[in-house]
Amino acid sequence: MFVMDAINWLMARPVLCLLIFMFIRSMIQSRQPFPEAGGRTKGAHSTAEFDGLVKEGLTLVDFYATWCPPCKAAAPIYARMSEEEAFAKCTFAKVNVDEVRAVASSENVSAMPTFGFFEDGKRSTQVVGFSEAKIRQMLNSKLKLNTVNDNPPKELQKVD
């Protein structure tokens, strides 16, 4: 009888049921592990590892925090980008700002996520916040990729 009374009480309050459901869902999601790496991304867990990753060539670093919802949303997209053939000449790295505070401090990271572009050990550009379009644009620019084909194959060129 008590169970039926409780069910009837909850059914009469759909907004409360929705709020309870959302609360329980957020609690479950917050306990899921943060995807530190994926694709071709490499984690830097110390200053030495960070320095080794950015030392040569082009490196894109994702400065993230495990408690940051935009960082969690960006992680799978960042991992997929790292697997794209067009970006194979770029190293994709991740730095947990709470774990490697010295790197976050030395790179003046104050908002998460922040994506830093490093060329031969020196930061050249950064994107604060996650914008896949901006990051792709910067990667295309740094790798000198043509997003528009100025020289189409001869079959497609106009013949007079």
Where are these regions (language model features)?
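Non-catalytic, surface beta->alpha helical segment in thiol-disulfide oxidoreductase systems
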Residues: 110-153
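Short active-site neighborhood of thiol/selenol oxidoreductases, capturing the structured segment around
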Residues: 54-66
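Hydrophobic heptad-repeat coiled-coil signature
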Residues: 68-71
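Intrinsic disorder/low-complexity signal
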Residues: 1-7, 39-40, 145-160
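Short acidic active-site motifs
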Residues: 49, 99-103, 134
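N-terminal targeting signals for export/organelle localization
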Residues: 1-38
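Thiol-based oxidoreductase modules, predominantly thioredoxin-like and allied folds used
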Residues: 63, 74-102
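N-terminal signal-anchor transmembrane helix
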Residues: 31-54
